From Swiss-Prot:
Domain bHLH span(s) in chain numbering: 20-71
Name of this chain's protein: Twist-related protein
Pfam families cross-referenced by the UniProt entry: HLH
Tissue: Expressed in defecation-associated muscles and neuron-like cells in the head at the L1 stage. In later larvae, expressed in SM cells and their descendants. Not expressed in differentiated body wall or sex muscles.
Localisation: Nucleus
Gene3D superfamilies to which the protein is assigned, alphabetical: Helix-loop-helix DNA-binding domain
Effect of residue 29 to A: Dominant negative effect on function in transcription regulation and mesodermal cells fate specification. Delayed development. Impaired vulval and non-striated enteric muscles development
Organism expressing this protein natively: Caenorhabditis elegans
Effect of mutating residue 29 to D: Dominant negative effect on function in transcription regulation and mesodermal cells fate specification. Delayed development. Impaired vulval and non-striated enteric muscles development
Gene Ontology cellular component annotations, sorted alphabetically: nucleus
Amino acid sequence: MVARRKGERVVRKNEVENVQQRACANRRERQRTKELNDAFTLLRKLIPSMPSDKMSKIHTLRIATDYISFLDEMQKNGCKLYGHSIFDEKRGYNLQSAFNMWRGNNGYTPIAGPSQLPPLQSAHIPPPAPSSIPPHCLMPQPWYQTCPPPKQEFHELCPISTPNPNSNPNQLTPIHWQ
């Protein structure tokens, strides 16, 4: 039996506690990083981007900032870009194309650095009143989605043919699109 000194035992106990604390801290940091990455993934899905955009975290934040400025301008101008409505009779509101055009005309580029971004006019910009923003301007619009024209009824989008009384009820009636 080897005799141990009192101090030696305390050192080993402290080492075990340190290892456990480090493991807990690492676990918390991994969880925090995962939550942050999940939030960026969601943000990347919500903001429109161009295929040439490198969607790093900082670039994602820059595009999100640009998109907020764009939506604010759309709200102030009644969903008009440079005096023209962004509503298309066939495709609805195409925020993706309008945002890309706005970004290009305002000098925002995928590689813009902090020195190239326009300065803020004021430190505090109050949010617009929720009732003053048209609902169709608030909906996030990924590149593959467009809004239907306002007040267009579902039956106009999906016409239903009237059944022929002489036809077999088990037979499908073709739909004739207008």
